[in-house]
């Protein structure tokens, strides 16, 4: 064990640049189309992309979602057909059938490789068909899984209104009563924060949005808007002087765009995952807004008290993150605080600047809990990781879906990493849900092994 | 460009990988960007595979793209050669990487010199063929490669087995009830005194491909995958094949008779032996072992008379099902269709005379529209038609891929052979309302659909919900809303809160474990 799990004093970063698996970044359409209720997502790619959305994510067109594939065929690839005309034809059809407030074009690896000029075509087509078109390059050449959301949000930053603009996002107002909108928006921007606006970015289900808003409201801080908003026509005002803070660790491009294009002030905080993270996140925002946190410590303590039954199950247990959704550092930090030992944090991409506060918090947590620092392995090699898992025999491996069954068959308890992407894990209120997920395989396998007495379900050893 | 929401058959590389990962000790390398490697997820999840899927993605990222991918691909191949020591490494691009127009054959040649295992490039056009065509092509390519290799090495096993024997070609991973069908076919063939020489690709070893010619003939249960291989073996080694799918009592009998003819032809030289005759076996199985023939005659099924159904699926299953329903069950088929557009002529010919119309399309919306128009009493289709049926309140039996986790039952559910006829009869029976039920429904005016009045445990009503609280409650998905409401009210009562706000709701949630 010591060979691969040395006691480190500082965080160790490695980059294996291996062959690893994550879901394609175009998966973000699966949650973003639900989040932005008046949107339509058009993924411009091949049959491979379409089959992925249909299969791996299990999202069929069952609910007639507001997304579709623009499937590139041989004629498109060999440039025998005119991209602009083809996209116009499809977008007109979408406009007629669904009439969305915005069409988001999701570029893929294929549009990158054939160098389709989506950014060039969008403004032309937008003015021609009179629907805003946002272009995001959620391709697997540059990004992994959840970073797809990052590309979409970064693209949307440019569509957020500025304070001096009376109109809402470009052209989206045509059928909305502007007066009532102004009335609605009006009071939001004065009141309690005194001219300091706070916009949070990251896509979360509306109930979690409410919870985090309430959490800040308790500290007398009013959230003036979220990116993305529930409706495209309600995108928040972004201007210089607006404070922005992220809720997800994979949004580094969005953060950079907010700072560069809108001169917003980024609040760099740990992410509001787990009671410890949520408290640190709220505290950081409070400090920027010059507020003394009220009852926060007590609130955190109460949440921890409520988690005690789960904590008893995880204390002293070890966990191995193979790396998938870029939530790994925050989750690892929370689990270490819960008393777990983290052997390895695999992560597809590590932006040390955007995650700086989270990394420092991880380091502090390790010191506080007196456990060794985990290795952070960027772009891990899944084959090597399996060898390490074999050697370390962690109590739990958090893995992609392709590795879960084979590991279970070899007696390693696993949890799908994607579940943390889709479950509600942010804020004080949902801390329990994280532990519910983490402990499920432990509870289940405990009860099975107790009565059945076998763990290995493959003929030869690993 | 095509606006697409859903597809029946996947992209070509999926077919190639299905074939490669079905063989034992074959490793496939996907030359693809991150995210294109979801095949591993599909196989691991759907087949509940215990072993790691023998497919590795050689990731193409911006870096690799800039430098050229040769180094990366060759390195991945040679590395897997050492780590897994496979007999064969198969390289495939995806739709995406195939447009890079790299000389992948050259990569393969280079890697082959450094590897112990054989290395080949799957030769498939990713924009012209679908999953099934690619699987057919890849299987043929692998078989051809090893037959030719054996020929040059002079160890091709050309001497036929003493007793009749068969190769079953086209059973593979992620197929529709393929494992069950294979077991049933083995049983059927054993009953006929025919031994199984090789089953490929599922569970087969490429080292044994040189033994394929030992069999007397090849059996191709599904025409989507295996036909190309059978034709190659016929042309190259003069091996006869049977491609009649033994599905339903009539086609199973036809299949057995074709086998009989081949055995007798092969056996000609051995004058002293009696000719093979399976008629007694067919008769016995049809009338007494399989329950299907009796079932459709039984009084229970009289109500099937004149019922309308629609059939849609891959060409093998849709054609067979159409014939079974029309000939063996006396059901009227308003429309039979397939998404295997490349096989349209064969399909039309097979179902002609058994249905009112034929629909050849890979556009699921056309199938849905057709179903809505015809309003059949039952549908026999894919998961998509099942979904359409749910929306229209028409029962649907699933008879064909694309596969779904439900198509991997743990119990024995073949569609082929005589046990398959029973399964299909059950499926048909469960898809229609039959017998007395039909009349009772008429008498009582449909099923009792009255809602069960929701039980509420909160008896005292001194609790009020604020408007915001109620709005928040309504955001919670319906199936857990009542539980959350109950828990919140319980919490409120315990804490002497009379007005429930959003804060109360979340405080209640946080307090659950306390």
From Swiss-Prot, chain A:
It catalyses: chlorophyllide a + oxidized 2[4Fe-4S]-[ferredoxin] + 2 ADP + 2 phosphate = protochlorophyllide a + reduced 2[4Fe-4S]-[ferredoxin] + 2 ATP + 2 H2O. One of its GO terms (cellular component) is chloroplast. Coiled coil: none annotated. It holds the Pfam family Oxidored_nitro. Pathway: Porphyrin-containing compound metabolism; chlorophyll biosynthesis (light-independent). Keywords: 4Fe-4S, ATP-binding, Chlorophyll biosynthesis, Chloroplast, Iron, Iron-sulfur, Metal-binding, Nucleotide-binding, Oxidoreductase, Photosynthesis, Plastid. Its cofactor is [4Fe-4S] cluster. GO terms for biological process: light-independent chlorophyll biosynthetic process; photosynthesis, dark reaction. Binds 1 [4Fe-4S] cluster per heterodimer. The cluster is bound at the heterodimer interface by residues from both subunits. It is found in: Plastid, Chloroplast. One of its GO terms (molecular function) is ATP binding. [4Fe-4S] cluster binds at residues 24, 49, 109. Its EC number is 1.3.7.7. Its main location: plastid. InterPro entries: LIPOR_BchN/ChlN, Nase/OxRdtase_comp1, Protochl_reductN. Belongs to the BchN/ChlN family. Component of the dark-operative protochlorophyllide reductase (DPOR) that uses Mg-ATP and reduced ferredoxin to reduce ring D of protochlorophyllide (Pchlide) to form chlorophyllide a (Chlide). This reaction is light-independent. The NB-protein (ChlN-ChlB) is the catalytic component of the complex. PANTHER family: LIGHT-INDEPENDENT PROTOCHLOROPHYLLIDE REDUCTASE SUBUNIT N (PTHR39429:SF3). Protochlorophyllide reductase is composed of three subunits; ChlL, ChlN and ChlB. Forms a heterotetramer of two ChlB and two ChlN subunits. This is Light-independent protochlorophyllide reductase subunit N.
Curated annotation (Swiss-Prot), chain B:
[4Fe-4S] cluster binds at residue 36. GO terms for cellular component: chloroplast. InterPro entries: ChlB/BchB/BchZ, LI-POR_suB-like_C, Nase/OxRdtase_comp1, P-CP_red_C, Protochl_reductB, Protochlorophyllide_Rdtase. Its EC number is 1.3.7.7. It is found in: Plastid, Chloroplast. One of its GO terms (biological process) is photosynthesis, dark reaction. Transmembrane segments: none annotated. It catalyses: chlorophyllide a + oxidized 2[4Fe-4S]-[ferredoxin] + 2 ADP + 2 phosphate = protochlorophyllide a + reduced 2[4Fe-4S]-[ferredoxin] + 2 ATP + 2 H2O. The active site is at residue 300. Pathway: Porphyrin-containing compound metabolism; chlorophyll biosynthesis (light-independent). Substrate binds at residues 435-436. It is an enzyme of class 1 (oxidoreductase). Its cofactor is [4Fe-4S] cluster. Binds 1 [4Fe-4S] cluster per heterodimer. The cluster is bound at the heterodimer interface by residues from both subunits. GO terms for molecular function: 4 iron, 4 sulfur cluster binding; ATP binding; metal ion binding; oxidoreductase activity, acting on iron-sulfur proteins as donors; oxidoreductase activity, acting on the CH-CH group of donors, iron-sulfur protein as acceptor. Keywords: 4Fe-4S, ATP-binding, Chlorophyll biosynthesis, Chloroplast, Iron, Iron-sulfur, Metal-binding, Nucleotide-binding, Oxidoreductase, Photosynthesis, Plastid. Belongs to the ChlB/BchB/BchZ family. Protochlorophyllide reductase is composed of three subunits; ChlL, ChlN and ChlB. Forms a heterotetramer of two ChlB and two ChlN subunits. Component of the dark-operative protochlorophyllide reductase (DPOR) that uses Mg-ATP and reduced ferredoxin to reduce ring D of protochlorophyllide (Pchlide) to form chlorophyllide a (Chlide). This reaction is light-independent. The NB-protein (ChlN-ChlB) is the catalytic component of the complex. This is Light-independent protochlorophyllide reductase subunit B. It comes from Pleurastrum terricola.
């Amino acid at each position: 064990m010591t060979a691969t799990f040395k006691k480190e004093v500082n965080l160790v970063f490695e980059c294996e640049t291996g062959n690893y698996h994550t879901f394609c970044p175009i998966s973000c359409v699966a949650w973003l189309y639900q989040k932005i209720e008046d949107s339509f997502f058009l993924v411009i790619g091949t049959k491979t992309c379409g089959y992925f959305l249909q299969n791996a994510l299990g999202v069929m067109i069952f609910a007639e979602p507001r997304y579709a594939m623009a499937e590139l065929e041989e004629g498109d690839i060999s440039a025998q057909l005119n991209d602009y005309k083809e996209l116009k034809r499809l977008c007109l059809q979408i406009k007629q059938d669904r009439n969305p407030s915005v069409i988001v074009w999701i570029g893929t690896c294929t549009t990158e490789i054939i160098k389709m000029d989506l950014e060039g075509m969008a403004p032309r087509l937008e003015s021609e068909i009179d629907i805003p078109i946002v272009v995001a390059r959620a391709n697997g050449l540059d990004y992994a899984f959840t970073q797809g959301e990052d590309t979409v949000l970064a693209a949307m930053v440019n569509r957020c209104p500025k304070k001096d603009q009376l109109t809402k996002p470009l052209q989206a107002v045509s059928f909305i009563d502007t007066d009532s909108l102004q009335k609605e928006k009006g009071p939001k921007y004065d009141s309690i924060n005194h001219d300091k606006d706070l916009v949070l970015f990251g896509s979360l289900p509306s109930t979690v949005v409410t919870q985090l808003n309430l959490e800040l409201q308790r500290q007398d801080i009013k959230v003036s808007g979220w990116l993305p908003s529930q409706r495209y026509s309600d995108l928040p005002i972004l201007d210089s002087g607006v404070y922005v803070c992220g809720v997800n660790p994979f949004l580094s491009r969005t953060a950079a765009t907010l700072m560069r294009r809108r001169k917003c002030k980024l609040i760099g905080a740990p992410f509001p995952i787990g009671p410890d993270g949520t408290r640190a996140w709220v505290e950081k925002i409070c400090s920027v807004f010059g507020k003394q946190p009220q009852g926060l410590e007590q609130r955190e303590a109460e949440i921890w008290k409520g988690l005690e039954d789960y904590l008893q199950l995880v204390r002293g247990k070890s966990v191995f993150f193979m790396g998938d959704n870029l939530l790994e550092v925050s989750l690892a930090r929370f689990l270490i605080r819960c008393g777990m030992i983290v052997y390895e944090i695999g992560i597809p991409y590590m932006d040390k600047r955007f995650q700086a506060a989270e990394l420092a918090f991880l380091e502090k947590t390790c010191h506080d809990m007196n456990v060794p620092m985990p290795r952070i392995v960027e772009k891990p090699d899944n084959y090597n990781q399996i060898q390490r898992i074999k050697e370390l025999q962690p109590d739990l491996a958090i893995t992609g879906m392709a590795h879960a069954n084979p590991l279970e068959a070899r007696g390693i308890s696993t949890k799908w990493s994607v579940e943390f992407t889709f479950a509600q894990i942010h804020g004080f209120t949902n801390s329990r849900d994280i532990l519910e997920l983490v402990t499920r395989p432990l509870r289940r396998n405990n009860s099975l092994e107790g009565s059945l007495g076998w763990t290995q379900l493959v003929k030869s050893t690993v | 460009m095509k606006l697409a929401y859903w597809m029946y058959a996947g992209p070509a590389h999926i077919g190639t990988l299905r074939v490669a990962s079905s063989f034992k000790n074959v490793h496939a390398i996907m030359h693809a960007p991150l995210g294109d490697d979801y095949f591993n997820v599909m196989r691991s999840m759907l087949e509940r595979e215990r072993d790691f899927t023998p497919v590795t993605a050689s990731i193409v990222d911006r870096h690799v793209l800039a430098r050229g991918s040769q180094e990366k691909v060759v390195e991945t191949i040679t590395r897997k050669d050492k780590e897994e020591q496979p007999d064969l490494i198969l390289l495939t691009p995806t739709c995406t990487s195939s447009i890079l127009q790299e000389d992948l054959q050259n990569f393969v040649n280079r890697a082959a010199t450094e590897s112990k295992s054989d290395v080949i490039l799957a030769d498939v056009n990713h924009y012209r063929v679908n999953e099934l065509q690619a699987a057919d092509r890849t299987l043929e390519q692998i078989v051809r490669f090893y037959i030719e290799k054996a020929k040059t090495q002079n160890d091709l096993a050309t001497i036929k087995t003493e007793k009749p024997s068969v190769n079953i070609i086209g059973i593979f991973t992620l197929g529709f009830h393929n494992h069950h069908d294979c077991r049933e076919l083995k049983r059927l063939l054993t009953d006929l005194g025919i031994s199984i020489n090789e089953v490929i690709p599922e569970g087969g070893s490429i080292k044994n491909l040189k033994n394929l010619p030992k069999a007397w003939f090849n059996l191709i249960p599904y025409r989507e995958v295996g036909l190309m291989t059978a034709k190659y073996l016929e042309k190259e080694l003069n091996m006869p094949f049977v491609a009649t799918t033994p599905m339903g009592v009539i086609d199973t009998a036809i299949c057995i008779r074709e086998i009989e003819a081949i055995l007798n032809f092969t056996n000609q030289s051995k004058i002293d032996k009696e000719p093979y005759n399976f008629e007694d076996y067919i008769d016995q199985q049809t009338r007494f072992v399989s329950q299907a023939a009796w079932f459709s005659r039984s009084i229970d099924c009289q109500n099937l008379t004149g019922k309308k159904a629609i059939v849609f699926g891959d060409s093998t299953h849709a054609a067979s099902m159409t014939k079974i329903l029309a000939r063996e069950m006396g059901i009227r088929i308003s429309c039979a269709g397939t998404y295997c557009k490349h096989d349209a002529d064969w399909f039309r010919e097979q179902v002609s005379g058994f249905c009112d119309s034929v629909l050849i399309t890979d556009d699921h919306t056309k199938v849905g529209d057709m179903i809505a128009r015809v309003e059949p009493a039952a549908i026999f289709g894919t998961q998509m038609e099942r979904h359409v049926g749910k929306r229209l309140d028409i029962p649907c039996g699933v008879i064909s891929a694309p596969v779904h986790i439900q198509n991997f039952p743990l119990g024995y559910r073949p569609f082929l052979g005589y046990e398959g006829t029973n399964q299909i009869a059950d499926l048909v029976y469960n898809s229609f309302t039959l017998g007395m039920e039909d009349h009772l429904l008429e008498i009582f005016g449909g099923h009792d659909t009255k809602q069960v009045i929701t039980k509420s445990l909160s008896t005292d009503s001194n609790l009020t919900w604020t408007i915001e609280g109620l709005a928040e409650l309504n955001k919670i998905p319906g199936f857990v809303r009542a539980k959350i409401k109950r828990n919140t009210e319980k919490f409120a009562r315990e804490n002497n809160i009379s007005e429930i706000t959003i804060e109360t709701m979340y405080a209640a949630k946080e307090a659950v474990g306390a």
